[in-house]
Amino acid sequence: MRTLVICLLMTFSIPMSVSARNILPLPAHQNELAIVIDDLGNDMKGTEEILSLPVTLTIAVMPFLPTTKDDAEKAHKNGHEVIVHLPMEPMSGKASWLGPGAITTSLSDEEIKKRVEEALEEVPYAVGVNHHMGSKATADERVMRIVLGICKERGLFYLDSKTTGKSVIPKLAMELGVPYLENELFFDDVYTIQHIGKQARLLSKALDRDDATIAIGHVGVTGMKVATMLKEFLPLYEKKASIVPLSDLIPEYHLIDESMP
């Protein structure tokens, strides 16, 4: 049924970006919010607390780490959506921050393809991909053409976390017919509870304005702070929007998914 998938993708004449406010067939009374939690896969702080939250989250799991499969299994069992949190080269930072199997601009086409495919096999239940770090790699057209090409082959969507203003993902996703979305807000780009609270309030204001919104938080250093913040703010968010998995923000996604063999 691959032909059906391609035909459906080609009907998307507008980018499936959260920043495009009115592209979704939403109920008149309700907006939609997708909350993504990055960096699972290494038994990080806040993992259990976040996976136990009583809403549907999108859980981004890093491949090749000690609890990669376990965290993906737990997320799926708890009703969350799972995506692959693919480690990709940043403009700066320690190589150790990337983790194993990172996609870098120095790799050959063949090695990039191999690493991406291995990463996808590592994370059970994954329906999409986003990147870990990646400010350099996501600005590289050669690298991202390979990554997005594999997403298309496998029927996966891509979330551009927007770690650089020079991302080539929107351009290439449109060209290749890959469903993509764009992050609007990081809860914890600064690690303090004051900043996380400020971002949580900004998100609340965005829900008054936007049909569809995506926000990203993390386990790890800020994991417990993010979990605490979400427990506090989720009742407010639920008054303003339906909290949904990322795939719900993509027109026709479920029809595409059901057409896969």
Regions found by a protein language model. Name each.
Residues 26-96:
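Active-site beta->alpha N-cap acidic-glycine motif
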Residues 151-164, 222-261:
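C-terminal domain-boundary segment and adjacent tail
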Residues 6-13:
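Bacterial N-terminal signal peptides
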Residues 97-98, 102-121, 138-143, 170-207:
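Alpha-helical scaffold elements lining the catalytic groove of polysaccharide deacetylases
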Residues 1-5:
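Positively charged n-region of N-terminal signal peptides that target proteins for export
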Residues 33-38, 57-60, 80-86, 127-131, ...:
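Hydrophobic faces of well-ordered beta-strands that scaffold small-molecule active sites
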Residues 20-31, 200-205, 240-241, 247:
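Terminal interaction modules at protein C-ends
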Residues 40, 58-64, 130-140, 154-165:
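Catalytic beta/alpha-barrel core
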